[in-house]
């Protein structure tokens, strides 16, 4: 089928490339001329495992092209996917200005039988409002909802092997077009969930908010384990092996971040408040997660006798999770900001996200470095803030020889505690008791 994606950000780009790989004729349209120019040279603006391979295959098969021009070629499209951003307003409400801008532009060019598919995350009733908006301008296009459930870092696999494909429609014609588009995935067993427009839109918000709730809950259980001597890793396993609960999103850490969870739970909370529903769970999760980076800094301070001023701290990992270069709403970045406000000197490293971090945060006391060794040299403490595999596989003996004080606080619980202790590190994970030994007790340190 002939498909166009409006917006070549994370969702539009991954979806467009894989749709081209699956055999559709795909056009990805974006206002950013520089981005489009790079894409035509096979230069991806995002990091996503294996995406470059599928980009190459789709281009070589002549099933994918990139443009920044809205023109009458759009008349050939059988479906237009809107995949633009929906950032949060100050109130927490989703801002749909980019969605409506895209609708205005495509409606002037597409044919009357073209299906407009809203893949951007939008509040319930958005599709119905778009239909009414189009009718007010003299258009009668079918509009469908098709939320995405891609996880950054594993988006290619998520698209090719989805848990489910959700579509919201108000007529059979729209459903049949979407079934045809997703036929390659349905044929291999993907569940195709058909519902109404409002429910489809709400499924995305409810899914992300529920997952965010799991993360906030396990983080608070980690705090309890820290106080009473429990083992958060065993607790997560023991709880998660219950099939009613599942093990995913039960990893204690510095909180959730990224472009979806924080934004979507705020939008859902705004929605329920607008309908005069007091959803205490959502408010509690938002509050808990907002406090989490500060709580992590408090733990760091505790390990340094409560005095952070003037300390040199290595922060390993800046992206909100491993497998992506995305630093949006990253807990690691928030932790760095708090440390800088406390007159700490921060030396930061990330294997993929350094450039995005530099665009996001600059400070006279912040150094971005190109290796773990450079970041750890002569520091008072090492903070592991993102769960990159390379941190787990580091030559920690070599790092021990570089640091001023051999203290590691692992906010992702990825390092082997006993192995670190054998080397000589004082190692602390989230959920472990902080048995504080004053830094001035030199017998526990090898001052550099």
From Swiss-Prot:
Q: Would the keyword Hydrolase turn up in this protein's UniProt record?
A: no
User: Carries keyword NAD?
Assistant: yes
Q: Which organism is it from?
A: Rickettsia felis (strain ATCC VR-1525 / URRWXCal2)
Q: What is this protein called?
A: UDP-glucose 6-dehydrogenase
Pathway the protein takes part in = Nucleotide-sugar biosynthesis; UDP-alpha-D-glucuronate biosynthesis; UDP-alpha-D-glucuronate from UDP-alpha-D-glucose: step 1/1
Catalytic activity, as annotated: UDP-alpha-D-glucose + 2 NAD(+) + H2O = UDP-alpha-D-glucuronate + 2 NADH + 3 H(+)
List ligand-binding residues for NAD(+): 2-19, 30, 35, 121, 152, 263, 328
Extract the SMART domains matched here.
UDPG_MGDP_dh_C (SM00984)
Active site positions: 260 (nucleophile)
Binding locations of substrate: 148-152, 204, 208, 249-253, 257, 321
Give the family, as the similarity comment puts it.
Belongs to the UDP-glucose/GDP-mannose dehydrogenase family.
